[in-house]
Every structure is written in structure tokens, then in C-alpha cells.
Amino acid sequence: DDAVADGEHAISGVVDS
């Protein structure tokens, strides 16, 4: 998905926690 939310990457919906 697109990097919209804070902590989210432009990769395949990978959330950086």
C-alpha cells in the first residue's frame, strides 16, 4: 500500500513499529 500513516513504508504495507 502507499505510505500514508506515520510509520508506514511505501513497501507492501509493511508497518515500521
Curated annotation (Swiss-Prot):
Keywords: Secreted. It is found in: Secreted. Its main location: secreted. GO terms for cellular component: extracellular region. It comes from the Eukaryota. Expressed in skin glands. The keyword Protein transport does not apply. The keyword Cell inner membrane does not apply. May act as an antimicrobial peptide. Belongs to the Frog skin active peptide (FSAP) family. Septenin subfamily. This is Septenin 1k. It comes from Osteopilus septentrionalis (Cuban treefrog). The lineage of its organism: Eukaryota, Metazoa, Chordata, Craniata, Vertebrata.
